């Protein structure tokens, strides 16, 4: 879930717009995960349009409602942070706290978040750990205070582990220069997120039997049953990507 959109803009500083960075991170994460089997990846947005168009609630709650409709195993929301203290830097995980309500959700968000953070740290990003925040005026059915952040709270209510990854601070020049400035830097963040997800769920790389076919000048990968394969395919030790809609080699 790439956070924000053109209508609901995120943080902005040092020439960086959060909604743009989030989208690049999300796409990179999706593309890397598509190399693996036993996983179906959905992305809440592929452009900067508002998610209200899905008719699943407002832009924020539509993200959780989509995950619920898809019976998702988890929802990972990509963000970058901002703070008035321009020296503050590092990544942070916003996860469900141990409220005792739908306990599986808090346990999973914390374990999955730890796996993702470990891979972000390998890029040199400082870890600010977990941030747990609650509401004073809303409670879960067991009487415990509800989680503050909508993505996290709705995940608890829907029994779908939902967490937010803050990849660093747009207000910090060093974080911007090292992690947000270029497309390759943003891709690295998305790949790190994907590796954390892969490690947590113990996913295996795809190895599809089949071969290349050229039809009307366009190259496809066709499996043994004659199906054109989209996404990433490994052939003779090399990875090839085929358009997710047309299945044509990119």
Where are the regions a protein language model picked out?
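Catalytic-core regions of hydrolytic enzymes
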Residues: 2-112
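Conserved beta-strand scaffold positions in the cores of enzyme catalytic domains, especially
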Residues: 41-43, 75, 151, 162-164, ...
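General small-molecule cofactor/ligand-binding pocket signal
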Residues: 42-44, 131, 221
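Active-site-adjacent mobile loop/cap segments within catalytic or ligand-binding domains
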Residues: 80-85, 129-205
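Acidic, glycine-rich loop-and-strand cores that form catalytic or ligand-binding grooves
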Residues: 103-133
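Extracellular adhesion/carbohydrate-binding repeat motifs centered on closely spaced tryptophans
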Residues: 206-250
